[in-house]
Amino acid sequence: PADKAGDAVRFDHVSLTYAGAGAPSLTDISFTAKRGQTIGVIGGTGSGKSSLINLIPRFYDATEGTVEILGRPAQEYPRAALRGSVAVVMQKAQLFGGTIRSSLLWGNKNAADADLWAALETAQAADFVRAKPLGLDEPVEQGGRNLSGGQKQRLTIARALVGKPEILILDDSASALDYATDAALRKALAALPGDLTVFIVSQRAASLQHADQIIVLDDGRMVGLGRHADLLKTCPVYEEIYASQFKKGDAQK
């Protein structure tokens, strides 16, 4: 058997049907993400992307099959313990009123300023924070109303990194970033020391071109698993997504 110590996330014939729903949201999903890998998740609206990643921090439990996190069945973890190891950054950035510093300290209240700046650098937020008159002490309005969409997204990614998770899930959370910032963020995450495993859920194929594996979902089923170049040859659904974006000019590097 494979060495489970090297596995960050393993799905073994996983299906998920939400309570009260007639049809399953996920059907028979199997894959293994090794520690340190970047995993892309792509598919059309309603394909099951959020359902898949919701199983990793145990927002829900699989109806069938097994989900293993860091070598153990997900159900063996108390949810609170799992949330320390798995950080999820949603598309809609949630920020509370206070300052940039207090916003980041939600990730880890004992973090030193050096840790905050390191997280801001990785999240491509350090430059805009430095440009603020008060830096880390700059006020943040409730919901981050005084920040742009891209600034809010970068701050919530930095906040997640301050918690030093083992698994980071970006659920379409770079959607407000331009391509250059998005690419710089992915490069910085890949360069982090240690074995951080990153799941990037994206509508943009261009954001996933350098992922170690890409999971392609269609109607709750996995219709492709592999690297970008291979999927273009073997997975019609992926090829179609990429071609439609490439025509529109969305698939810039």
Language model: regions and residue ranges:
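ABC-type nucleotide-binding domain
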Residues: 2-253
